[in-house]
C-alpha cells in the first residue's frame, strides 16, 4: 500500500502521483487499486503511461477520486473494474458532467434505477470493463451486462456508507491477486463484505 496524507489541498495526492510515476515501471504487482486520490487528469494520464511500461499489465481497479479522474480523462475503458456506489454511478452516467459536483439533477434522481445508470455509463464510454455497483443490492456488471446481483445478508447500516466500500474494494483486490477472475471475485467479494457486516453486529 502507498499512502500520502492529504487534507484536501492536493499536496499529498501530487506526492503520491509523482511516486507512482517514478516507481510503477519497475513494479511487478498483479493488481493495482487506486482509491482516494484527488482527481487530476494530467497526473492520471502520467500514471497510465507509467503502467504501460510495466513488464506485465496488472488488473486495474479504481474507486472514489481515481475513478473520477479516469472518467474525466476519457480513459475509463482502460480499467478492469470500477466500484461505484449509486451516487458515483450517476456521475459516470452523466456524459456532460466534468466533475461529480456537476452531475445533473435529473440523473441524480435516477439513483434508484441502477440498471438505467449502468446502461448510460457504458453507452457514453464512461465505465470500466467491469463494475461492482454498491447498494442495497450490489450489481456485478461485465461489459454493460449485469451478470450477478447480491442482496444478502442485508445489513442496512452497511449499505454504501463511508468505509464499507473500502473493505469491498480491498476484498476484490485480494481475490484478484489470489488468481480469481474478476467476475467471480466481484461476486465473492460482495458476499464476503456483507457477511463481515452481519458478523460485526
Q: Can you say where each PLM-predicted feature lies in the sequence?
A:
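Ribokinase/PfkB-type carbohydrate-kinase core domain
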Residues: 3-78
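Short, small-residue alpha-helix embedded
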Residues: 91, 161-191
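Conserved phosphate/ATP/ADP-binding segment of small-molecule kinases
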Residues: 70-147
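Short pre-catalytic strand/loop immediately N-terminal to key active-site residues, enriched for Gly-Thr
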Residues: 151-163
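Charged C-terminal helix
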Residues: 194-201
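Short, acidic/turn-prone active-site loops that include or flank metal/cofactor-
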Residues: 4-8, 86-88, 153-156
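Short, contiguous, well-ordered secondary-structure segments
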Residues: 143-145, 149-151, 171, 175-176
Amino acid at each position: 500500500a502507498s499512502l500520502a496524507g492529504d487534507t484536501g489541498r492536493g499536496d499529498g495526492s501530487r506526492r503520491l502521483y509523482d511516486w507512482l510515476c517514478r516507481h510503477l515501471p519497475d513494479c511487478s504487482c498483479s493488481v493495482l487499486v487506486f482509491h482516494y486520490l484527488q482527481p487530476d487528469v494530467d497526473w492520471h494520464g502520467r500514471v497510465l503511461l507509467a503502467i504501460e511500461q510495466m513488464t506485465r499489465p496488472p488488473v486495474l481497479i479504481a474507486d472514489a477520486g481515481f475513478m473520477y479522474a479516469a472518467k474525466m480523462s476519457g480513459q475509463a475503458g482502460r480499467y478492469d473494474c470500477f466500484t461505484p456506489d449509486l451516487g458515483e454511478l450517476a456521475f459516470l452516467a452523466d456524459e456532460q458532467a466534468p466533475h461529480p459536483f456537476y452531475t445533473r439533477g435529473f440523473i441524480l434522481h435516477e439513483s434508484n434505477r441502477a440498471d438505467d445508470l449502468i446502461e448510460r455509463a457504458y453507452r457514453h464510454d464512461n465505465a470500466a470493463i467491469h463494475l461492482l455497483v454498491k447498494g442495497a443490492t450490489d450489481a456485478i456488471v461485465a461489459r454493460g451486462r449485469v451478470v450477478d446481483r447480491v442482496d444478502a445478508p442485508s445489513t442496512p447500516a452497511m449499505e454504501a456508507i463511508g468505509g464499507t466500500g473500502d473493505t469491498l474494494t480491498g476484498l476484490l483486490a485480494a481475490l484478484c491477486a489470489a488468481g480469481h477472475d474478476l467476475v467471480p471475485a466481484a461476486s465473492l467479494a460482495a458476499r464476503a463484505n456483507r457477511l463481515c457486516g452481519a458478523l460485526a453486529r
